[in-house]
A protein has these predicted regions:
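Protein kinase glycine-rich loop
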Residues: 23-31, 35
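Glycine-rich ATP phosphate-binding loop
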Residues: 34-53
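Conserved HxN/HPN-centered segment at the entrance to the catalytic loop
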Residues: 75-88
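Conserved alphaE helix
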Residues: 81, 94-97, 102-164
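Activation segment/activation loop of eukaryotic-type protein kinase catalytic domains
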Residues: 155-188
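Conserved catalytic-loop aspartate of Hanks-type protein kinases
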Residues: 207
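C-terminal lobe substrate-recognition/regulatory segment of protein kinase catalytic domains
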Residues: 244-284
Length: 284
């Protein structure tokens, strides 16, 4: 595989990608990819193309994501199971590209848009319940396939229909099988389960923790566990949820970075979170 000096690929309006996808506009930019809206001139439909930035590590991770997306799409209906429908993937101008259905804003951007326009009535209890049910349907489906999402957050839940309050779960780039060698650096910090923070072995329950944090956030308008430091986040978790379970103290490889032998939190952070992309604090 060759890698050009330019890490990002830019297109002009109406330019054809791979002779089939007519470029419309950029939708968003992430750490290792850019999402663009295109019109598929063959199938006569709008699509989203995720363009992976030109970097070997990003490429390798995206290949793993494609394999997982193919597996998930082959085992269930994306509409019934509320996950992203993938149409195609290909290599173009030394960039890997993933073509999927075009959805609307993610939960974070949508909520921010509503609050910026003084309209917070959309997220009623009834609508939150409806959205929650769809996310749970997706989680039940992937968990039955022995897959942990590992990065559930408002940015990874996209609205399908604002009117109908329908949504889909996206971004399986950090996902893994429960029997895999599990990574210590997963989940965005505000949605990170305590067993992950403390270096314990984890399973499907970490997705449920993230979902609980998301629901509290869209109901109250505030991030439940602000990520100014892991130390203060653990203090908030203990304050809201109660003491850390004994098994986490016993099994956690990172417990000594945060707690004394008396199970008291150190006053100052004693560990560095190496996942720099997870250090952003959100404000509505």
């Amino acid at each position: 595989i060759g890698y050009e000096p330019e890490k990002e690929l830019k297109f002009k309006k109406d330019e054809l990608i791979a002779g089939r996808y007519q470029y419309e506009k950029e939708l968003g930019d992430a750490a290792f990819s850019t999402a663009v809206q295109c019109f598929d001139i063959k199938e006569k439909r709008y699509v989203c193309i995720k363009i992976i930035k030109n970097n070997k590590d990003y490429f390798d991770q995206s290949i793993d994501e494609i394999k997982l997306l193919r597996y998930i799409n082959a085992n269930g209906d994306p509409d019934k199971k509320c996950f992203l429908r993938v149409y195609d993937y290909f290599y173009y101008k030394e960039h890997l590209m993933i073509v999927s259905e075009l959805l609307k804003d993610n939960l974070y951007d949508f909520y921010k848009y509503l609050t910026d326009n003084n309209n917070t009535e959309y997220f009623s209890v009834e609508r939150i319940q409806k959205l929650t049910k769809q996310i749970l349907i997706c989680l039940e489906f992937i968990h039955d396939l022995k897959i942990i999402h590992c990065d559930l957050k408002p940015e990874n839940i996209l609205m399908k229909s604002i009117t109908d309050a329908t949504c889909k779960v996206i971004d399986f780039g950090s996902s893994c099988f429960v029997h895999d060698h599990l990574s210590a650096y997963i989940q965005s910090r505000s949605y990170r389960a305590p067993e992950v923070i403390l270096g314990c072995r984890y399973d499907y329950k970490i997705d449920m923790w993230s979902l609980g944090c998301i629901l509290a956030e869209i109901y109250t308008g505030n991030v439940l566990f602000q990520n100014d430091s892991i130390q203060s986040m653990l203090a908030r978790i203990i304050g809201i949820c109660g003491p850390i379970p004994n098994w986490m103290y016993e099994k956690g490889k990172l417990v000594n970075d945060f707690f004394t032998k008396e199970k008291l939190l150190y006053m100052e952070p004693n560990a560095v979170d190496n996942n720099e992309s997870m250090n952003q604090t959100k404000k509505y």
